[in-house]
């Protein structure tokens, strides 16, 4: 893959030209030998030298300065219309669409291809072009690191393991369940996600007890008319889910628990929780967040066009299958 000469490459080239180590018998510079020494193609070295009238005039500093001046003039940024810019700002800075989703929505809206690829759009966002705000990316534009800590918030005994699941033919009707905890563990949200459609549900908890979790679980089931439609629920071995038998009876389903300290066994809910955390970062006091605010965020999440669903939303996929 071709790459431009770095400043240090140019310094080495200048030193080699001045030292006259690679001279031919006729006194001319052996460009092929220099290129081989620098591990570059002969044409690359020739193009670099031809920036100057003669080889003796070559200067690494001047060459680098000329390079950056040309780069500044070569501004290929696309000129959007006012309507297009407003749409981009709305989708990215308000609804926080991912770059790939923004490109797809742009195509649906204007019936023309987005002017750049996903990789270049990420570059635009990080450089702040067109008013893009980097903090609206997932994880606010920072690299995500797993801490590898085990969960020590209380464990359950006497339950069904995920290894007890038999004859799971598809993800239709299978839910994953979790709680998202707020500041100082004094507030929380109960969350569920349907595996096939990625439809996300979230409701505030008044407290972090098993009885409250059971109550809010029933509210979600009733509101979404899910009684008898759930094939199974996968969750953690935490004490707030100790009323799992009551949940099974009410929803006419089965509840299965992951191995201790193994959140990777329910990867979808962990991923969806990170989307919720994008709006409500760690340290958020959910006692100060209304259910209306949570509903707005959940609606934005469920309205996202997802590549894994062939560019339809979780909301639409859920209605088609449940």
Swiss-Prot record:
Residues 153-322 form the Integrase catalytic domain. Disulfide bonds: none annotated. It holds the Pfam family rve. GO terms for molecular function: endonuclease activity; nucleic acid binding; transposase activity. It comes from the Viruses. InterPro entries: Integrase_cat-core, IS30-like_HTH, RNaseH-like_sf, RNaseH_sf, Transposase-Integrase, Transposase_IS30-like. Keywords: DNA integration, DNA recombination, Endonuclease, Hydrolase, Nuclease. The keyword Secreted does not apply. One of its GO terms (biological process) is transposition. Belongs to the plectrovirus integrase ORF3 family. This is Putative integrase ORF3. The lineage of its organism: Viruses, Monodnaviria, Loebvirae, Hofneiviricota, Faserviricetes.
């Amino acid at each position: 893959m071709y790459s431009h000469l770095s400043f240090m490459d140019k310094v080495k080239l200048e030193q080699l030209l001045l030292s006259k180590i690679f001279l031919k018998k006729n006194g001319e510079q052996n460009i092929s030998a220099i290129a081989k020494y620098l591990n570059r193609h002969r044409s690359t070295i020739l193009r670099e030298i031809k920036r100057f009238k003669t080889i003796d005039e070559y200067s690494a500093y001047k060459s680098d300065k000329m390079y950056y001046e040309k780069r500044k003039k070569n501004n290929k940024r696309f000129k959007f219309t006012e309507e297009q810019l407003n749409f981009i700002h709305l989708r990215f800075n308000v609804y926080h669409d991912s770059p790939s989703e923004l490109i797809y929505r742009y195509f649906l809206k204007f019936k023309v291809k987005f002017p750049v690829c996903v990789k270049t759009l990420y570059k635009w966002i990080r450089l702040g072009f067109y008013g893009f705000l980097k903090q609206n990316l997932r994880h606010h534009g920072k690299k995500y690191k797993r801490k590898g800590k085990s969960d020590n918030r209380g464990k359950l005994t006497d339950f069904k393991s995920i290894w007890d699941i038999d004859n799971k033919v598809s993800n239709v009707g299978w839910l994953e369940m979790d709680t998202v905890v707020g500041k100082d563990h004094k507030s929380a949200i109960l969350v569920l996600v349907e595996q096939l459609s990625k439809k996300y549900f979230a409701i505030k908890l008044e407290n972090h007890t098993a009885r409250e979790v059971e109550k809010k679980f029933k509210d979600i089931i009733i509101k979404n008319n899910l009684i008898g439609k759930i094939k199974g629920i996968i969750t953690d071995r935490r004490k707030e889910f100790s009323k799992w038998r009551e949940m099974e009876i009410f929803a006419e389903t089965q509840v299965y628990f992951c191995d201790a300290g193994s959140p990777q066994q329910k990867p979808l809910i962990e991923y969806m929780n990170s989307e919720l955390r994008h709006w409500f970062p760690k340290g958020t006091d959910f006692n100060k967040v209304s259910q209306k605010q949570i509903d707005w965020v959940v609606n934005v999440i469920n309205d996202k066009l997802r590549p894994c669903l062939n560019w339809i939303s979780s909301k639409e996929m859920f209605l088609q299958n449940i």
